[in-house]
Structure formats: C-alpha cells, structure tokens
C-alpha cells in the first residue's frame, strides 16, 4: 500500500491516515470521518473513502460492512437510545394563535373532508419546547410588574456560554452582543450601515423569501449567485459566478446564510474560507444569518463565519436567535455578534433610530431558560429526531416519487423538492401538485418565492408518525403513478 496516496482530496487525507484510524478502532465510515475529516460533505471523496475502508476491513477480517456503507443518521441506531424529552406527542395547536396550523398558504384551496391538517410549511416546529423556557417565563410573571427594565448580566452570560459550548467561540464579550427584535431587522440595520439605498447586494439562490422582501422593501437591488448541485446532489457555491458578479457589478455588501435556508447546506471550513477571501478581495461587507446554526443534523458541524479568519471576524455582522432552535418566534428576540467596534456602534445606532428595537422582558427570560444546560441536552435530542425524519423523507422520496429530486439537508429541518421532471412527465403544473397536496391535508409551501421555479418547501419538524402519514398521503393521492 502506498501510504502517501491521497484518498480524500478535499482535506488531503492519505491512505496511511485512514489505515491508522482503522487500526485505532474505527470500524465505520462515520468513525473514520471523525478521526480524519475524510469524505466530510464531499460526495466523490466519500465514495473513495468507503471503498478504501472496505478493502482495509476485508484485509483485516473485520466484520462490519453495513457500517461502512450506511448513510449518515441511521434510524436503528437512534431507536436504541432512550429520549429524555418528548418528541412524539401530537400537540393540538388549533386556536392557540399558531399560523402553522390555522392558516393555509394558498388561496382558493381547502382541505377535503376526511383529512386533518398536517402543518409542513412555515419554519415552525410542532414539538413542545424545553421545559426550562416555560419555567423561566412563569417565574418572571409571578412578579406582577412588567415596567421598563435593563437586560440582566445573566442574559449576556447565557449567550456567551452557549456560543462557547456549541460553536467553540472563545473570547466573546458582552460588548460584542446586541439585541435585535428579529434577524431580518438586524439584516436591514446592518445593510443600512454598509450601503446606500439602491446599492447592489449579493445573495445565493435559492433564497430565503424573508431576505427578498426585506431587501426589496428597503430599496436594495438583489443580485443572485445561484448555488449548483453537484453529481451527488449536494448544493455547492459557484465561486466563479460569485466572483464575476462581485467584480463586474461592483458589489460591496452581501447577505450570507449559514446554514443555508432553504437548501440546508452546512458549509465546510474550506468553503467559508474561500467565500470570505472573495469578500476580502473585493471589499465586501458581510451580514451572516446563522439563526439555523443549532439545527445541525447527524454527521455535520456548524462553523461560525466570523471564526475562519481575523478579516472575517472584522467585516462580518453575525445574527443568531433562540427562536428557531426552541420555537420561540412568537416571543420575538434575536441578537447580533459584532467584533468590529466601529461597525458595532453604527449598527446599534441604526437599529435604535425608529425606537422599535427594544427587548421584551419575557423574551429575555425565555432565552436565559432556553440556554440552560437542559436546553443543550434538549437540542441534542431534537437534532437526532430531525435527522431521523430527514432520512425517512429523503429515502421515501427516492423510492416512491420518481421524477422528484431532493438534496439531503445537512442542517435545518426543511426539504426543498424539485418537481420539474415529474411535472413534465405527468403534464402537470406545480400549482396542480401543490393544490393536490393541500386537499389531502399536507400543508406545504410554494418554492417559487425561494427562487425554486418548480419547487416545494417542506417542514419536517413534527412527530414521526405525522411525517409518515404525510408521505403516505402524497404517495397515494399526489405522486401516484397512473
């Protein structure tokens, strides 16, 4: 064996390193990936590594081939691990002010008699959140005065500890943290500092519809750099297209989404480094939406954009929130992390100009409750449940919905279905497909506002029994072969 032969080109992992990992006890692809980073998020390298591992295991008479070839996030593994928190109870949210269950995002279409609604559209989870959130809110409401207040030190300490524990962020201080009513408000405030109205701003498409509305409503000209799917179906940044647009259109501000919504990509370090190097080269200021950074599926790791270089740290406004992680959108409350003091002062001033950007006392206590150790534990279990749901849906689509294409998300709990081929083969429009799903109670979301022309966006953050029921209905009533 040539131990110097490079098996994984992306991370320059050699045959010798993989062999050593196996000798150290790694008996599955997942274990080798942890030890060497080999094949991480790279389809071509993953296949090479698996094939090379099979040869080593066979040579050493180690029986475990199914571990080598299995896809990440196996349900059988998860089912052997008991859950402390409840992700199986079906909550009745009707009449509780939840648009996810009380609204249908399509006009002139109703659910047929005999079908109940399965909410799979807006990014809102149908799980009970961690108990410490409710406990923190209830404890504060017992003190029956809710007047003007100052954020307590515990609020900042909770954020600092959360970022250190989950994202390995060292050296974060209270001064770098600022409140934002919402991530989109923070995006606009940062752009108002970086740009003048009418300036061009780079986004990668498919694009979160909230970005589109926020930027257009505030007078910015959006320039899209489309992501491309590689031969393994993984969404990739088109660096050539990105650089060309930055250079030719003189763009000096960008909104970056990490993990990406709606595609679900969890960017690798080399991708972030290359993106930020282009932004440095063309003097582009960056707003990084990292609201999904806690929802990372099995086998992947979130890397904060600001962490990849000192320059990235100084030119980036990063936005986070507990709202997506713990289903707290109705309470309002996000925060920014800005290390550059000049930018930080200007963003905070911009955010305060309309007097809208004021923290809610219950929102503050909700974050403190969410970011407790119990919250860390709850998110860990949540991500296992979501990984299982994603695996189930992805495999079901590939097996049953011929002509429907989908990339397996690495983060978030949203699927983006591409129905182009299916619609062409069955002479159907995407409107007809969407209507057929809603009529049988699968309340999903039109992908076109996300720049997915024949796409459908689906939320998988609900108990598995509902996910299975939804896909059974789609198979029987929507994508059934004639």
Each language-model region and where it sits:
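Immediate flanking context of iron-sulfur cluster ligation sites
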Residues: 2-5, 23-40, 59-65
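Conserved core segment of the aminotransferase class I/II
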Residues: 309-387, 394-395, 399, 472
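PLP-dependent enzyme catalytic core of the Aspartate aminotransferase-like
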Residues: 425-428, 435-444, 449-482
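Local cysteine-cluster metal-coordination motifs and their immediate loop/turn environment
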Residues: 4-15, 36-51, 66-74
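Helix C-cap/helix->beta junction micro-motif
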Residues: 218, 281-282, 312, 440, ...
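Conserved glycine-rich beta-strand-loop-beta hairpin in the small C-terminal domain of fold type I
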Residues: 368, 384-394, 406-420, 454
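N-terminal small-domain helix-loop-helix segment of the aminotransferase-like
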Residues: 84-182, 189, 373, 481-482
């Amino acid at each position: 064996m040539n131990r110097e032969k490079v098996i994984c080109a992306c991370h320059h992992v050699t045959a010798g390193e993989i062999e050593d990992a196996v000798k150290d006890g790694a008996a599955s692809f997942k274990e080798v990936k942890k030890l060497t980073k080999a094949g991480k998020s790279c389809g071509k390298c993953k296949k090479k590594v698996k094939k090379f591992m099979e040869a080593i295991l066979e040579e050493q008479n180690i029986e475990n081939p199914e571990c080598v070839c299995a896809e990440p996030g196996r349900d059988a593994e998860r089912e052997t691990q008991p859950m402390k928190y409840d992700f199986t109870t079906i909550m009745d949210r009707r009449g509780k002010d939840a648009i996810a269950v009380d609204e249908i995002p399509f006009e002139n279409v109703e659910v047929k008699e005999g079908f109940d609604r399965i909410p799979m559209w807006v990014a809102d989870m149908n799980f009970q959140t961690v108990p410490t959130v409710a406990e923190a809110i209830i404890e504060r409401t017992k003190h029956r005065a809710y007047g003007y207040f100052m954020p307590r030190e515990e609020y900042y300490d909770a954020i600092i500890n959360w970022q250190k524990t989950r994202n390995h962020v060292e050296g974060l201080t209270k001064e770098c943290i600022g409140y934002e009513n919402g991530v989109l408000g923070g995006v606009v405030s940062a752009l108002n500092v970086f740009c003048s109205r009418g300036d061009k701003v780079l986004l990668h498409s498919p694009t979160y519809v909230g970005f589109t509305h926020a930027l257009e409503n505030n007078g910015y000209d959006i320039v899209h750099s489309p992501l491309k799917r590689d031969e393994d179906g993984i969404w990739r940044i088109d660096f050539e297209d990105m650089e060309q647009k930055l250079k030719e259109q003189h763009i000096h501000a960008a909104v970056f989404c990490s993990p990406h919504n709606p595609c679900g990509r969890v960017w690798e370090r080399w991708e972030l480094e290359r993106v930020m190097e282009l932004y440095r080269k063309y003097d582009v200021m960056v707003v990084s939406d990292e609201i999904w950074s806690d929802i990372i599926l099995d086998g992947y790791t979130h890397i904060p954009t600001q962490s990849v270089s000192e320059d990235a740290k100084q030119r980036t406004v990063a936005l986070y929130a507990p709202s997506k992680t713990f289903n707290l959108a109705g309470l309002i409350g996000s925060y920014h992390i800005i290390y550059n003091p000049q930018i930080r002062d200007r963003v905070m001033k911009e955010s305060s100009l309309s007097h809208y950007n004021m923290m809610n006392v219950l929102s503050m206590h909700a974050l403190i409750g969410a970011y407790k150790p119990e919250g860390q534990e709850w998110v860990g279990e949540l991500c296992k449940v979501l990984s299982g749901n994603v695996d189930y849906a992805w495999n079901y689509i590939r097996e049953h919905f011929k002509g429907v294409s989908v990339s397996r998300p690495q983060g978030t709990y949203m699927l983006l279905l591409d129905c182009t081929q299916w619609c062409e083969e069955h002479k159907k429009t995407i409107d007809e497909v969407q209507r057929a799903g809603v009529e049988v109670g699968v309340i999903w979301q039109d992908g076109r506002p996300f720049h997915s022309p024949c796409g459908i966006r689906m939320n998988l953050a609900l108990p598995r029994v509902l996910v299975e029921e939804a896909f059974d209905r789609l198979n029987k009533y929507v994508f059934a072969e004639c």
